[in-house]
Amino acid sequence: MFLKAVVLTLSLVAVTGAQAEVSANQVATVVWDYFSQLSNNAKEAVEHLQKSELTQQLNALFQDKIGQVNTYTDNLQKKLVSFAMELHERLRKDSEKLKEEIRKELEELRAGLLPHADEVSRKIGDNMHELQQRLGPYAEELRTQVNTHAEHLRNQLTAHAQRMETTLRQNVGNLQASLTPYADELKAKIDQNVEELKGHLTPYADELKVKIDQNVEDLRRSLAPYAQDVQEKLNHQLEGLAFQMKKNAEELKAKISANADELRQKLVPVAEVVRGKLRDNTEELQKSLAELSSHLDRQVEEFRRNMGPYGETFNKALLQQVEELRQKLGPYAGDVEDHLSFLEKDLRDKVNSFFSTLEEKENQDMLVAVPELQLTPVPLES
């Protein structure tokens, strides 16, 4: 299933120009999750992978495109299969090699920082405090924005439901003709308001990435005087830290979007029920409209409750990652399993590069037939 998913993803992007539908990040996640689950060698984990939301999402997309998939040439399919297999095989081979490289890097970095161990620990602690000060307002602002825009969504939809109730009372004789436009508009309003909600909330993740870059750069500068002989190794570790922290920001963004989509999925069926009741008697329709209003209240409140802790949870995760860096660089760190984050970062960089190559090829040669498209696999390590 893994190879089929990756091959079809890359085929879809290469041939149909569907970069907007299937991203490099999605493909990298499929490959990385598969590698991680097989590395754990747990039957339950592999079963979970097969049922994961991402796999279902990609499979659904491919089913929609199955007619196009069947038209791909054997030559292109072979190239893409080769690339997908190479990704996974290189992950497996590079894992142990990179693990040893990171172990040696940390060993040399700790030795270089050892004469200044107390100062280094204090500087990292100061950085954690600064990070906490930077992130605190964002967590509170996210909570405020969630409450504000969720309330706006509820008010918009409740007002629409109330207009339907008023119309119902005034047009008892011709309910279907009077209320059908309102029922159709209700679904459109749900879609519109949920999209606006996502539009207001998801940019926070991008703003947090900027703060992460600022914080990591501040940390690099503060530690530079103590790492003159091992600066390159320190920079590499800080790159890994920034990658992990930004991954948390992406996960926050995905959670916000997923919660908003879940809210939509819970609201739309109720609107459809109301539309279906237009053929019923007035009493049944009044009951449905009353249930609609209470359902709106419950679902919006549940959304607010679910979203409430996200900001604080995100902040704690970032602070914990900086604390883990402090422990890694300390004199008593011992062996640390730290190579996987670097391996994942390298994988995502290479998949992004592969997608960029496809996009450039497509832009430069839009009229070239599909069989003439040449793809060059991008190795995981240069």
UniProtKB/Swiss-Prot annotation:
UniProt xrefs under InterPro entries: ApoA_E, Apolipoprotein_A1/A4/E
Cleaved signal peptide residues: 1-20
Keyword Phosphoprotein: yes
Localization of this protein: Secreted
Keywords, alphabetical: Chylomicron, HDL, Lipid transport, Phosphoprotein, Repeat, Secreted, Signal, Transport
Segments of this protein annotated with the region 13 X 22 AA approximate tandem repeats: 33-330
Keyword Repeat among UniProt keywords: yes
Entry GO MF terms: cholesterol transfer activity; phosphatidylcholine-sterol O-acyltransferase activator activity; phospholipid binding
Listed Pfam families: Apolipoprotein
PTM comment, free text: Phosphorylation sites are present in the extracellular medium.
Gene3D superfamilies tied to this protein: Apolipoprotein
GO biological process: acylglycerol homeostasis; cholesterol efflux; cholesterol metabolic process; lipoprotein metabolic process; phospholipid efflux
Repeat region (Sequence), residues: 33-54, 60-81, 82-103, 115-136, 137-158, 159-180, 181-202, 203-224, 225-246, 247-268, 269-286, 287-308, 309-330
Gene Ontology CC entries for this record: chylomicron; extracellular vesicle; high-density lipoprotein particle; low-density lipoprotein particle; very-low-density lipoprotein particle
Record text on subunit structure and interactions: Homodimer.
Cited function: May have a role in chylomicrons and VLDL secretion and catabolism. Required for efficient activation of lipoprotein lipase by ApoC-II; potent activator of LCAT. Apoa-IV is a major component of HDL and chylomicrons.
Domain-level remarks: Nine of the thirteen 22-amino acid tandem repeats (each 22-mer is actually a tandem array of two, A and B, related 11-mers) occurring in this sequence are predicted to be highly alpha-helical, and many of these helices are amphipathic. They may therefore serve as lipid-binding domains with lecithin:cholesterol acyltransferase (LCAT) activating abilities.
Family assignment from sequence similarity: Belongs to the apolipoprotein A1/A4/E family.
Protein name as annotated: Apolipoprotein A-IV
Taxonomy of the source species: Eukaryota, Metazoa, Chordata, Craniata, Vertebrata
